[in-house]
Amino acid sequence: MEVSFSAPPPPDAASAAAAAPSLVPAVSAAAVAATTVSCSPQPPTGSPSADDRILVSVEVLLHATSTARAEDVCAAVERMLEARSLSYVDGPVPIPNDDPFLLANVKRIQICDTDEWTENHKVLLFWQVRPVVHVFQLSEDGPGEEPGEDDTLSSFNEWALPAKEFDGLWESLLYEVGLKQRLLRYAASALLFTEKGVDPCLVSWNRIVLLHGPPGTGKTSLCKALAQKLSIRFKSRYSMCQLIEVNAHSLFSKWFSESGKLVAKLFQKIQEMVEEESNLVFVLIDEVESLAAARQAAISGSEPSDSIRVVNALLTQMDKLKSWPNVIILTTSNITTAIDIAFVDRADIKAYVGPPTLQARYEILRSCLQELLRVGILTHTQGGNSLCLLSYFSLMENQHCPEVADPHGSVHLSGLLHKAAEICEGLSGRTLRKLPFLAHASVANPSCCDASAFLHALIQTAQRELSESRG
């Protein structure tokens, strides 16, 4: 099985051509020349064999109107990659103008999974890599609701994956290094163990993920993005992928003992979906503590006794789903201590999602400013060149260079952004993405906002937001 793991964005082929290519020239002059000429790559003596090469995912998004076979597109992309002696870096790959087949059918080509190497300042050269191409189209159907009984709240929302609503969500989420890769690898291992027929009596795994942490850290978004990413990676194995977002509040009845029955009915519908072997189903239970409230609290009298039946029904139904190989349960919680210990014990991965680190805060704010520059809300040109804010690692490497003295240079402006990120310690990712809007609203002349003035306003806004959050 060829499974690889992920990273970054781009909206379409046009922006991909304008963006920095994710396949960048190798360090040598010969490799630089190779970027403009198709050639047969010649790996150096002693290069790794095919089995030892690093798997790197290449995600290929087709146009909504494309009717090309995935196999044909995959072969065309592989030929395109083989014809170029390049190093691999996360990001968009420009579609060659001399390939009418790809131009007509492909909206975007994206290199993924190299972030762990770039974090360690390593370069992946073409002869070290084995690309794994994933071809997909986005569903534009939107969410569907499963109506509850007697005009009550719908019991769940359903998405066909990969969905247009979640496109780019994975790349926009920034956490400590390794968290997203860990979740991807877990899911790949869980499906592999099932596919190979590993005896669950000897090796136990439940295909249950629990993300916990304070509100606003992106736990629910990460679950949706993970389901989207896995639906792309396993598209060749499962012809259909679905995300079922459970509305936990709809499962509580005003009638005594009815709540447990509602949980059983919901999971019966989910079981009908997973009975189709070609269907991969992700079940998302947000704020699972509302369902899995501790039975001990109910026994002590601080929780209604009906909650015992709800917890028992939830655990029983989850155990039933374990026998089906094509379902993964994703759960989130803001209050881990309120969850029944029997539920926590069933989760294979219990990952804490805390407030973003300094690096994550910087990259979140940088992505916001890049978007404002892209649409023209912020303006900045120095010497005819548009502003290019440095990545976190590039800034760390260049913070003592002479260009820091230039108040309009990229290094100086990136330093101001870094100062804002330092001030924002303790703020959630949700709050961080609001700051650029609040900063723009505080600028004296918002219709013509210079990047330098905006960054100073952003620092003031961050200080004000932090003081307000601390009371």
Curated annotation (Swiss-Prot):
One of its GO terms (molecular function) is ATP hydrolysis activity. One of its GO terms (cellular component) is chromosome. Keywords: ATP-binding, Meiosis, Nucleotide-binding. InterPro entries: AAA+_ATPase, ATPase_AAA_core, ATPase_AAA_CS, ClpA/B, P-loop_NTPase, Pch2-like. PROSITE patterns: AAA. GO terms for biological process: meiotic recombination checkpoint signaling; reciprocal meiotic recombination. The keyword Lyase does not apply. ATP binds at residues 213-220. Gene3D superfamilies: P-loop containing nucleotide triphosphate hydrolases. It comes from the Eukaryota. SUPFAM superfamilies: P-loop containing nucleoside triphosphate hydrolases (SSF52540). CDD domains: RecA-like_Pch2-like. The keyword Cell membrane does not apply. PANTHER family: PACHYTENE CHECKPOINT PROTEIN 2, PACHYTENE CHECKPOINT PROTEIN 2 HOMOLOG. Plays a key role in chromosome recombination during meiosis. Belongs to the AAA ATPase family. PCH2 subfamily. This is Pachytene checkpoint protein 2 homolog. It comes from Oryza sativa subsp. indica (Rice).
